[in-house]
């Protein structure tokens, strides 16, 4: 699978400096939801994306190249409280420039925490994507923390109902256990037309 050939390409704080891509998959989510860990597990790697227990570690747009001009993009987490209002505004601008203003073919994967559940910020992000007609999916990470309380089917159904999306748009994974990634890997491989 081509995803295991993914390499770090560049980091930038300005989306306008990104070269044009053929297609890209963009990961967004609340701070400390495990975006970097999801990317590592998705690509069969341990340290491709830097992880940290400190929320707000990712403060730049991190781009990973799979094959020529087909990218995974990790955006800064939203909702981290310990930054200034000005820095939050810069992050918001960075996210808008990357997702809306760039004209590359794209799909956004919104990562939510199964244990915490979707937050107001997650709903705001999904509403914003819908308003801008940006295709998106939901990844429910940290499922290992709740499977002794609820079933995967219950998580899937509740997520679909809350976000008003189709069943194929929900992916339940555990980056920590590296489980549940097969369906997500196939979805991304198909979207990016990887071989």
Segments (PLM) and residue ranges:
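Generic structural signal for conserved hydrophobic packing positions in ordered secondary structure
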Residues: 8, 31, 64, 91, ...
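Canonical P-loop GTPase G-domain recognition
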Residues: 2-16, 145-195
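Structured catalytic cores of enzymes that bind and process phosphorylated ligands/cofactors
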Residues: 32-33, 39, 62, 107, ...
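Conserved nucleotide-sensing/catalytic segment adjacent to the nucleotide-binding pocket
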Residues: 68-105
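Helical mechanochemical/support elements of P-loop NTPase systems and associated helical scaffolds
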Residues: 47, 60, 71, 87, ...
């Amino acid at each position: 699978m081509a995803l295991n050939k993914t390499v770090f390409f560049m980091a930038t704080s300005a989306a306008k400096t990104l070269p044009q891509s053929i297609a890209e998959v963009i990961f967004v989510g609340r701070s400390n939801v495990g975006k970097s860990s999801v990317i590592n597990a998705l690509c069969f790697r341990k340290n491709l994306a830097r992880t940290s227990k400190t929320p707000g570690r990712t403060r730049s747009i991190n781009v990973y190249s799979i094959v020529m001009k087909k990218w995974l993009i990790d955006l800064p987490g939203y909702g981290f409280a310990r930054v200034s209002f000005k820095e939050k505004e810069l992050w918001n601008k960075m996210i808008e420039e990357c997702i809306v203003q760039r004209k590359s073919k794209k799909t956004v994967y919104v990562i939510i925490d199964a244990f915490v559940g979707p937050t107001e910020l997650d709903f705001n992000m999904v509403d914003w994507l819908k308003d801008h007609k940006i295709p998106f999916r939901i990844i429910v990470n940290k499922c290992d923390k709740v499977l002794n309380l609820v079933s995967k089917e219950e998580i899937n159904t509740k997520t679909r109902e809350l976000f008003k999306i189709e069943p194929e748009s929900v992916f339940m994974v555990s980056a920590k256990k590296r489980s549940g990634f097969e369906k997500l890997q196939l979805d991304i491989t198909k979207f990016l037309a990887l071989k």
